[in-house]
Amino acid sequence: LWLFHSPANFIKTFCHSAVNGALLFIQLCQPLFEVIMNKNKLKALALPVLKNAVSLRLRIEKALARRRKMAEYNPALEHDLNIVIHNKQLNTIPKKVWMFWAGTLVPVEIQSFVNKVARENPAWTVNVVNDSNLSQYLPELTFTRQDLLVAHRSDVIRLELLYKYGGVWMDASIILNQPLDAFLAVNEDNRYDMIAFYREVSTVDQRYPVIETWFMAVPEKNHFIENWLRYFKPIIEEGAAAMFNRLQQLPNYKEIAQKITNPQYLILNITQQQALREYNQYNFYLRKCEANAIYYQRLVSWDAVQLSRMIMVDKLPEVLPPIIKLTGLDRKYLSTNLKYGVINKDSLLGEVLFADVPQKQPDTSIAEMPGRAPVTLK
């Protein structure tokens, strides 16, 4: 009788129930796909299925108008470490940004992040270093080991570039929401050896803070970088496994490692601790990354699906953190979210992507990146 008297309402209710049923099915299947992915033989098959399932789920939620608003950045959560040991006036931090991207293809979101930095910091030169142009900047640096991870090669490169030229090292996966001059304004009297971030949960002893390596601002020929490089550069010859085994044999290894997660991968952080313990007479201004650059990851306990929804679907807050650091995990569902039209133009990632790169543009080579002066992309 209801169908006969109100066919429009019946169809609307039926469609709504069908969509909710599909959404529930995808949510129930998602843990199964993740379990399957833990089996290496099935990972290649399961990963595309999982990505499509998650993106379809987000697309359905978007269709049902289930949008939220991202949490506001809360400066009250900040706990800066202003460490001043000496009264020396150091060299000015040069207006140079350094990034590294291995290979020749750059994902569309990385193109947009780089362009955003250049566009909003016109007085700075943004240099994207890659395997092809590395010799232009560091002609004496060579890598002979085939088993050295890209991450560890990048670690050597960032220290070498910062020591030789100074400036700001930024991972290419950073979304910069504040002009660099404003972010570095604390250094107006050139007193700091480094301006960077520290990870509070990894730091046991605040005399030796665990400094994050994805954003570091230093003057050229900085003694701290030189000392750090001396401890880390042997990885080129030793390899990561042998070097980590050697570090583990140190009598003070537990003190050095503090609570660094995955130390066999984060050897750069371990050697940073070595350098600090040898000579700790540096001035640092360190921001708490949990309250700033990885604020949103912490809010969702590093859940990739929740974070995808937050940065690609949800509305922007009134105030964003000055810097947002994204990882491969955070961008895990980006390609399928683009495919299904999940990303909203007024979301965090949408605002950056749609600023200068069409949504469906494929990954392009470094030489084809749509950089704007003064970006250096050779």
Please report, for each region that a protein language model flagged, where it lies by residue:
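Glycosyltransferase-associated regions of secretory-pathway enzymes
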Residues: 37-154, 172-378
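Small-residue hinge/turn detector
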Residues: 155-167
